């Protein structure tokens, strides 16, 4: 009567089941029959059963209605002999479906009859029994490409098809179809295309648990991040042998080999845990390693870790954000990191550092091949110096995407090439003062030598210059408040620095900007330049570059005790019972102590002069930051004068911010150079009458692709040429920033007394000393930009730091020379 669906009505059964149950069973049996039963004839006339083998991809869905295949099953067949299958068709009508032929007519009446036969258990050899009773043999474990759930040989093959409702309904323990009947088993003879032993097949495979699935799905996300590699690398003790705990997730999966190879390539860049690290007890671990005595070895290895960590962090910081994001995606996908230098020199440099071989690195790169660290106290060997530049591929080069100049200019501008510059200077100073014995002839020769270029001048300009020339892009980020710290009073800042003599502009890198001194004795000293210079912040989380706690010899106060086991564990990264002797000079320093609120506050400690054999014992629970020596002599290249300069130096405790939750601290440098100065002691390779400082500069920048410095090949080699070094100093700009005189500052005016006014509410603290303004404070306002600061702070800044506004870098005051011009 116009019905489009001419289906026969189902035969009613005597079973107390609902029509929905029958309908579900019919649909399931129909689907099963269409997939698996297809009797056919062979050439010899025997009847063989033709079964469709399910694809390995069917684990996601039990049925797929695709036009080219029967519900997602390929046209592979399993051929069995005629002895195992009935040759009698169930009906005379023929039926075909998607290329699979059958002699049974699948109408609703026949299916209902089959259902009755199954329920009554009288059809042991019926087509339904052949289809359902042997379903466990129709899902064998593939012998070829297997799913990732089956890569473990000890895990049986599982899939969602085994847990499908139409199979689990017949999977009860009292179901006779689960018994292994030889009549329906697949033989392992030559006629079978399936070679997996039958005994390995089971129809009750346990499905993976939720935890196992999550572990497999999230396996690619278990890779440690770069900062974790860095944390592990810094926390290891280079003076001991370490067996590396593998950062690769423990898994027996075959696909983990890809992750292992990718992680091995990443580990080769950082090599956090070498299996055997060279030390005094195992010098054969590295062919070029020179054994050092206990404390010397710890110091050199600590310097190696520090320099390596700073280099890796700086490289990551100068890579543009697009390259960093792409590199993170590559690492997440199991591909190796793309942070590689062009010629591989940076990797070799890190390898030398990871070998604890800092001394040999410096010796091999010194200007004079005979310059070595000697134990002879009368030795006049030059200070070891090291300068290396490393070039990294740009974003387009690293991803093999050559773009024309027009395309680069239209989209993101010219391609910028990351360049890393590493400088180290080892300064060995003697307590003997040779300055009075210097003759006039030697002094004239010394002054003449200052006109020549040297690596000292290079490192000096690197530290002093805050900007490159106009042809170069800005290299360092400007930051007015890079780290948080307590609010000290102005008296604390004025007492924190005890200058002994005036610092010349061409002396130690960053000395004028880091530690400003006044030319007049009545002018207060404040630490201002470190908060407003372009800085490179080396962010190393949970690491141990904080120097180990050291107990002052005479009269130490208990203010520097920190009752925090977590901080103590950071400080005590190696042998907590080791002793580290080194020489000291009279100084006043700041010691940070933790208050009740969890912050660190400064306190003053005076450390008297001690001889060279004085020792400081390492004790956990104490925090002492980096020790800095800054000679105050004007001469730069004279070894004898430089040796005597430390007798008139002072000590400054580097100010750090430590976050209780993340153990995050940042070491700030002046004018864009990461000054990481660590004192070594006089034992073993150093004589007892000498002590030395290491000056380490690690910073980088982005240069245009066609910049002349990138075409200078020798700058990126171990032995740069004199002319190229001279050109590099030109690119870096002048070492000394223009300053104003006291007369120029006084003539500029702008003095006023601060009172809490609505018009000044936006500037509630001085950005130089970071102290909150109080009523009655004398301030000076710059005429060019209208920014104001404490009079003492801004006067010190303009006369000793830079004649510019600390906030906006606008011109400070007009000098007399500018007025004349």
From Swiss-Prot:
Gene3D superfamilies: Zinc/RING finger domain, C3HC4 (zinc finger). SUPFAM superfamilies: RING/U-box. Keywords: Metal-binding, Zinc, Zinc-finger. Residues 58-88, 185-203, 279-293, 437-450, 579-622 have a biased composition (Polar residues). A zinc finger (RING-type) spans 766-809. One of its GO terms (molecular function) is ubiquitin protein ligase activity. It holds the Pfam family zf-RING_2. GO terms for cellular component: nucleus. It comes from the Eukaryota. PROSITE patterns: ZF_RING_2 (PS50089). Residues 517-529, 568-578 have a biased composition (Low complexity). The keyword Metal-binding applies. This is Uncharacterized RING finger protein C4G3.12c.
